[in-house]
């Protein structure tokens, strides 16, 4: 960093950003689950969301794989698993406004490779009133059963895993002050 000769060495603060609330929601399935579900190419697919992992201030509610947020400014980070579906992308879709809020990055999970990827989505947005959202996912190649991620497939008596559940889609939500 090079400063001009006239600089006095101080840094000006442009704004304060703080978070008043935080929540985590996810698609949580039993450890016996072998796969996250079929991911079919050709259109956006809604990802499962069924559990509030943490929401101490009640900023989010979940129903039918959709979540509701009240008016405010939010930062959202989501990870969406994919397996052998080639190119993948996730998106945050605003059901209330019938529009996409943000598209995520593109990740590649080769159809012949034994590789699972985590597609990521990061965004900051403001809503003026309560709005319903869902996480959507699209892929290049249909993968039956495993396309939406690989589970543990741990049956009773399995000693390989200490977990009794597996997380697929994970959404972290920060509400700004």
Predicted regions and their residues:
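Fibrous stalk/shaft segments of extracellular and virion attachment machinery
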Residues: 1-22
